[in-house]
């Protein structure tokens, strides 16, 4: 019931030095991407945070192509023509939680990947009661971390995988790409409008 899929990949050569330079300044970008203009829209969005000395490198084009491929894969999985895209260095999910979405795709390109636990290693009642992480995790030796460049798709909702931002990413920079179905953005916007009224 508590589903997750993780596709393991090797970190390509040149990634470490490229992202080390990119992470010198914090950033966060988001937008809606469509299958029709995906390559162009993605490039325009990412250009906002890429220094000139990095945008001319071969690895930059490799990274853009990788993000495009992952985005197109998620569009097929979700059977939709658009998706919500987020890319940033700041991750602030300290407490274990589940995402309020059917599925979410995560790729950590630099830094430590998302921390997660199997359901049998978690106290779901403690989680539902709002207890701290120490009460939610039954055994710290059972913690899992998504490796850099691996593609993770987590089921959300009440049967979602419990996960959080690891301490290393809370206290230092990393680069995470997050993809959601466009209905997620609509639901968040609707809830914000309701709060204002």
PLM region descriptions:
Residues 88-91, 157-159:
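Short beta->alpha connector loops
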Residues 90-148:
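Catalytic core of non-heme Fe(II) oxygenases with the double-stranded beta-helix
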Residues 86-87, 95, 109-119, 181-183, ...:
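Active-site environment of non-heme Fe oxygenases that use a 2-His-1-carboxylate facial triad
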Residues 8, 12:
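Gly/serine-rich nucleotide phosphate-binding loop at the start of the catalytic core
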Residues 136-197:
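Catalytic core of Fe(II)/2-oxoglutarate
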Residues 1-2:
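Short, small-residue-biased leader/transition segments that mark boundaries at the very start
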Residues 15-85:
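A glycine-rich, hydrophobic loop/mini-helix early in the fold
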Residues 5, 104, 173-177:
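Short beta-strand micro-motifs in enzyme catalytic cores
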């Amino acid at each position: 019931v508590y589903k997750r899929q993780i596709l393991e990949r090797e970190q390509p050569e040149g990634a470490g030095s490229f992202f080390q330079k990119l992470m010198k300044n914090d950033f966060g970008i988001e937008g809606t991407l469509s299958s029709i203009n995906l390559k162009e829209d993605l490039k325009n969005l990412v250009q906002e945070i890429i220094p000139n000395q990095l945008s001319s490198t071969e690895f930059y084009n490799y990274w853009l192509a990788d993000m495009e491929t992952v985005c197109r894969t998620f569009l097929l999985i979700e059977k939709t023509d658009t998706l919500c895209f987020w890319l940033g260095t700041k991750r602030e999910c300290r407490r274990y939680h589940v995402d309020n979405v059917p599925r979410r795709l995560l790729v950590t390109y630099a830094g430590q990947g998302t921390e997660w636990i199997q359901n049998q290693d978690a106290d779901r009642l403690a989680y539902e009661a709002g207890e701290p992480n120490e009460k939610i995790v039954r055994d710290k030796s059972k913690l899992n971390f998504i490796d850099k460049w691996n593609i993770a798709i987590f089921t959300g909702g009440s049967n979602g995988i419990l996960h959080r931002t690891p301490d290393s990413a809370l206290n230092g920079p990393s680069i995470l790409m997050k993809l959601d179905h466009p209905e997620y953005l609509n639901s968040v916007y609707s809830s914000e409008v309701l709060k204002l009224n």
